[in-house]
Amino acid sequence: MKKKPIYLWVLLILSALISATSLFGMLSPLPSKEALRAAQKQVAGVSAQQLEDQLNYTYRVAESTHSIFNIALIVLSAILVVVAIVFLVRKNLQYANYTYVGYVLLAIIGSIYSYVTLQDAVQLVQDETMSLGISVVSKAVSILYIVINVLFLALVFYKMWRQQKALAEEEETEDLA
C-alpha cells in the first residue's frame, strides 16, 4: 500500500482516548451511597423523593460500571486498541483493520449492555417525569453510540474493500507485464 492509513490512525487515537477514560473510571473506587448523598445539593423546586431517586439511580449506574462483565469489556477493548496500534506501527494494515473491527463490535456490545443496565437503573426512579426523561436520554445516547460505531465499522470495511481492490488491480497489472 502506498497510502498511509490516516483514517485508522484517527479512529485508533479516538478509541485509545475512550479506552483510557473507561479504564480510569473502572479503576476509580465505587462511591458509597453516603458519599453520593453528601455530594448532592439541595435545589429549589426538587423534592426529597426526586433527590432520593437521583441518588439511587446514580449509585446503580456506578455499580454497573464496576460489574465483572463491564470490566471485562473495558479491559478487552483496551487490549484490542493496543494490539491494533501495534499492528499499524508494524505496517500490518490488514491485521490492524481486523483488530479494529473486533474493537468496534465489542464497543457495540458495550453500548447495548450499558443501555440494558441503564434501563434497570431507571426502574429505581419513582418520579414518572424523571424516569421518562432519564429513559429517553439513555435511549438516545445508546442509539447515538451504536450509530457512530456502525459508521466507523462501515468506514473500515470500505477502506478494506478499497485496499483489496487496489491489490487485485496491482496483481493483475503484474500478470500482464
PLM features: what roles do these ranges have?
Residues 127-165:
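Alpha-helical transmembrane segments and their immediate juxtamembrane flanks
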Residues 90-127:
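Hydrophobic alpha-helical transmembrane segments of integral membrane proteins
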Residues 33-67, 113-141:
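Interfacial non-cytosolic loop connecting adjacent transmembrane helices
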Residues 1-38, 155-164, 175-177:
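Cytosolic juxtamembrane helix and N-cap/initiation of the first transmembrane helix
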